Amino acid sequence: MLFFVNDYCEGAHPAILQKLLETNMEKLSGYGTDKYCDSAKEKIRKACGCPDADVFFLVGGTQTNATIIGSVLNRYEGVLAAQTGHVSCHEAGAIEYTGHKVLTLPAENGKIKAESITDYVETFYGDESHDHMVFPGMVYISHPTEYGTLYTKKELEEISEVCHKYELPLFLDGARLGYGLVSPEADVTLEDIARCTDVFYICLLYTSPSPRDLST
């Protein structure tokens, strides 16, 4: 059975497990500050074509989404996302818990259009009482979407252009990014995503025992 929920529900590649075994007894500084993390950061920057990019390591998609959105937005701002988007439907109020509202946009097969962002922003600022409303502060998309659909390079560039026009940071959820990048129908590369977005993340495969595993 093929399982496409996200990129981190599979076990680790045997070569990764072997390397973990080989380095297990090394004494290193805290996670994120050791030589292996430094090496990983450089490899990620090279793959993205962004030599000056900041790279951080977090655990789990929901935590990452909440951390990024909570860090980018001002207290009076919300995040624009598809009405079918992951942060809109499937994160159990994690974004709202940070004090920010998810401002939903109409979606077509899970995707939002640049025109929808323009319409929302223009309508918002055209309302004389907008000072009493939640301001649009950033845009969230995922690739693939909740429906498994992919943004084309043209669509991504159009969304990026609108976001720059209105000074809205563009955030791409990468929980399923690996599937999107290797799809035979995709024309978007990792470098395209790095160029068009302000922040995105890449999920890495890992193995983590569940409580049930520990009890057996």
Language-model regions, residue ranges each:
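Conserved N-terminal alpha-helix of the aminotransferase class I/II PLP-enzyme fold
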Residues: H13-G61, Q83-S88, A94
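Conserved core of the PLP fold type I
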Residues: D52-L73, L103-G110
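Conserved PLP-anchoring active-site segment centered on the Schiff-base-forming lysine
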Residues: S71-C89, T118
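PLP-dependent aminotransferase-class I/II
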Residues: G99-E146, Y151-E158
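Catalytic PLP-binding core of fold-type I/II PLP enzymes
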Residues: Y151-S183
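Conserved active-site segment immediately N-terminal to the catalytic lysine
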Residues: A186-L204
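Single conserved hydrophobic/aromatic residue that forms the stacking wall/gate
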Residues: Y206-T216
